[in-house]
């Protein structure tokens, strides 16, 4: 599958930088980065449905893509597996959802759960969100790229 990169969300210009950061972190992330480099242009990137103001920094500064599950490259009924990209200095606002969620951090960023403090995660770290917990994430001076999985069942 080949996708015309002109259809990518503008924030996708940060993917090479994110993958370079991850590729410098060790053999596992280097291999994952190389595989993702060959895949990301095929993915259906779109802003979150939580963002409707097309002029907002959040709308222009983030994108999600589903790889497996509803709306992804491969349909699956019990899991959604995808990736989120956040441009530098953008916050993905507080939200919650019924499915349990896990993240694998590809390029660093901060997470917050419930009313807790922000906590930093580096490439290769993980984050776990229990069902219906309020959570948010934000990037710093570098873009944040993270793979996520939602258990639908």
Residue ranges and their predicted role:
Residues 1-77:
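A short, N-terminal "cap"/entry segment at the start of jelly-roll beta-barrel domains
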Residues 66-68, 84, 103, 138, ...:
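Residues in well-ordered beta-strands of folded domains
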Residues 76-77, 104, 120, 130:
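Short solvent-exposed loop/turn micro-motifs enriched in small/polar/acidic residues
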Residues 86, 93-123:
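A short beta-strand-loop-beta hairpin characteristic of the jelly-roll/cupin
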Residues 101-104, 141-153:
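A short hydrophobic beta-strand segment most commonly corresponding to one strand
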């Amino acid at each position: 599958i080949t996708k015309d990169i002109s259809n990518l969300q503008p924030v996708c210009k940060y993917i090479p930088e994110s993958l370079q950061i991850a590729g410098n972190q060790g053999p596992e992330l280097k291999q994952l980065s190389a595989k993702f480099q060959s895949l990301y242009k095929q993915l259906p990137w779109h802003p979150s449905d939580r963002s409707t103001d097309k002029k907002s920094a959040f709308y222009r500064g983030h994108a999600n893509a589903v790889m497996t599950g509803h709306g992804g490259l491969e349909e699956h009924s019990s899991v959604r597996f995808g990736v989120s990209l956040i441009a530098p200095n953008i916050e993905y606002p507080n939200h919650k959802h019924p499915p349990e969620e896990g993240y694998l951090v590809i390029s660093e960023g901060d997470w917050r759960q419930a009313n807790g403090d922000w906590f930093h995660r580096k490439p290769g770290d993980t984050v776990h969100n229990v069902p219906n917990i309020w959570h948010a994430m934000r990037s710093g001076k570098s873009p944040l790229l993270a793979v996520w999985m939602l258990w639908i069942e």
